[in-house]
């Protein structure tokens, strides 16, 4: 796989050198899993190392020349993601290019996302943080806009704020996939 060509060992060393943070075995396993699989779920409580792990994942894919997109369900979460990664993040709605035309111009149609199956997102890797706040409808729209071959990394804490709409991703059983910090 072209994204694994440089090896993960370099990422671990670079992480230590640039941040002074030594990755533990669970974090290394998470990075390997994210590099190996098209869909990866990273979940864990506060202080478990999710941010450090995500930063190392970003470093790995950056080193491979991958186009990376970061997003979160709210502006506040996206801003925090930008601050902690140093990489620009945006809301999922903005990532999917919500067409917010005024109601009188919609001709009976609701607002829609410009990015979808016919006009997919262009990225090698998409990382979504605060997944516990994403409802099933937004998740469906996101999945429609992701093409085969794009790695989708979902990050969250199932014990944090629930989604505002119906059902959230936390019903996925991340602990059964081995994708748990």
Question: How should each PLM-predicted stretch be described?
Answer:
Residues 60, 64-66, 72-80, 84, ...:
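Conserved helicase motor core of SF1/SF2 NTP-dependent helicases
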